[in-house]
C-alpha cells in the first residue's frame, strides 16, 4: 500500500510537467540483440522479463530543454526452468523534451518525470524495435503489451542489467 501512495504523490508532484512538456526528438543511441535458437519450436513456450530505467542526462534551464535516457531490456525465457534466455533485446533511447518558458522544474521533479514518463514515451518505439528485431531473427512476431505504470501484464520490471548503458 505504501508503494501505491508514493506513486500517487510522485504523479501529483510532476503533474504540471506531464501537462506541459513536449517531445522534440527521440533517437536510438544504443542497441543489442541476440538469440540462441533457430526456430520457435526450439524455443518452446516462453515468457517475458523486462527491465527498465530512465534518468535525466542534461537540463538546459535557459532554453527549457532536457534530455532523458530511457533504457529497456527484454529477455524471452523458456517457461521450463533451467534454460537460458532464447532472445535478448536491449535499447537505449534519448528523448529530448522542451518546457514552456514560464515553467521551471527542480532536478527532483525532472528525475521523477524521467522515471515515469521517459520509459512511457519510449515504449512505442521500443515495441516496434523488438518486433522488428525478433522478425529479423526469423522467429515469430512478438507484440509487447502497452506500457502500464502498474505491472498488470506478464511483464516483470527489474533493475536494468549493468550492461545497458
What do the predicted segments below correspond to?
Residues 1-121, 128, 132-165:
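N-terminal intrinsically disordered, cationic/polar leader segments
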Amino acid at each position: 500500500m505504501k508503494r501505491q501512495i508514493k506513486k500517487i504523490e510522485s504523479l501529483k508532484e510532476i503533474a504540471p510537467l506531464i501537462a506541459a512538456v513536449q517531445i522534440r526528438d527521440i533517437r536510438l543511441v544504443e542497441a543489442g540483440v541476440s538469440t540462441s535458437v533457430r526456430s520457435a519450436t526450439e524455443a518452446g513456450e516462453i515468457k517475458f522479463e523486462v527491465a527498465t530505467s530512465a534518468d535525466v542526462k542534461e537540463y538546459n534551464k535557459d532554453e527549457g530543454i532536457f534530455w532523458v535516457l530511457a533504457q529497456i531490456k527484454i529477455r524471452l525465457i523458456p517457461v521450463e526452468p533451467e534454460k537460458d534466455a532464447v532472445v535478448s533485446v536491449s535499447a537505449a533511447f534519448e528523448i529530448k523534451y522542451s518546457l514552456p518558458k514560464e515553467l521551471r522544474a527542480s532536478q527532483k521533479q525532472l528525475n521523477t518525470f524521467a522515471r515515469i514518463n521517459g520509459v512511457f514515451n519510449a515504449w512505442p518505439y521500443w515495441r516496434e524495435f523488438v518486433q522488428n528485431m525478433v522478425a529479423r531473427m526469423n522467429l515469430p512476431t512478438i507484440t509487447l503489451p502497452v506500457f502500464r505504470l502498474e505491472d498488470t501484464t506478464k511483464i516483470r520490471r527489474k533493475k536494468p542489467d549493468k550492461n545497458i548503458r
